Regions:
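Bacterial N-terminal signal peptides that target proteins for export
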Residues: 1-12
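C-terminal motif of bacterial Sec signal peptides marking the signal peptidase cleavage site
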Residues: 19-22
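Bacterial signal peptide processing site
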Residues: 24-26
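Terminal targeting/leader modules
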Residues: 28-40, 145-147, 153
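Beta-strand-dominated lipid-handling architectures at cellular/organellar boundaries
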Residues: 29, 52-54, 76-79, 152-161
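Post-signal-peptide N-terminal segment of Sec-exported extracytoplasmic proteins
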Residues: 31-32, 39-73
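An acidic-aromatic
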Residues: 56-102
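Mature, soluble, non-transmembrane domains
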Residues: 82, 91-161
Length: 161
């Protein structure tokens, strides 16, 4: 009988620890509210939402009239509204080019793209004009603009205060 009591106590303790630590593990390291525009020939979204940065993933949630219209997760794979693919497949389908895998995460994180090619510092951030790819990328304080004229792709992120 005492073994059953001990097992029961361990089970309860394990369940509590799993529940508590499980919820704790998914807390974002950083969250920001944004106006997010993602305009491509295959997808057109421009609404308000959130960017959540976790240890091993980035998540973008965009809402329209209180309903989730875009749930984009960047981790080992990239998932859009629950449908996952590898980065190259996503880049070809939505960015219409075989960019390197981390380009979308770099844009969201305000990091220079293409190893800082043609990087020009500005008074509020930096800009890059990559002529051979017809890309203009600009980071200025709380505004990020990625415009790929060749492939008709625009990503604009304005962080809200």
């Amino acid at each position: 009988l005492s073994i059953y009591k001990f097992s029961f106590k361990i089970s309860i303790l394990s369940a509590f620890a799993t529940l508590f630590l499980g919820c704790f593990a998914y807390q974002p390291q950083h969250s920001s509210s944004v106006l997010f525009s993602f305009i491509t020939p295959n997808l057109r979204i421009s609404d308000a939402g959130f960017i959540h940065k976790y240890t091993n993933q980035t998540q973008i949630q965009i809402y329209n009239s209180g309903a989730l219209v875009l749930n984009l997760k960047l981790a080992e794979n990239i998932c859009i509204n629950g449908v996952c693919s590898d980065y190259q497949s996503f880049n070809i389908k939505y960015l219409r080019s075989t960019h390197y895998d981390e380009i979308l995460d770099n844009i969201i994180s305000k990091i220079p793209i293409y190893d800082g090619a043609n990087l020009q510092k500005t008074n509020c951030g930096f800009e890059q004009n990559i002529a051979n790819k017809m890309i203009k990328y600009e980071v200025c304080d709380n505004l990020v603009k990625f415009i790929d004229s060749k492939n008709m792709v625009k990503i604009i992120i304005r962080e809200l205060q």
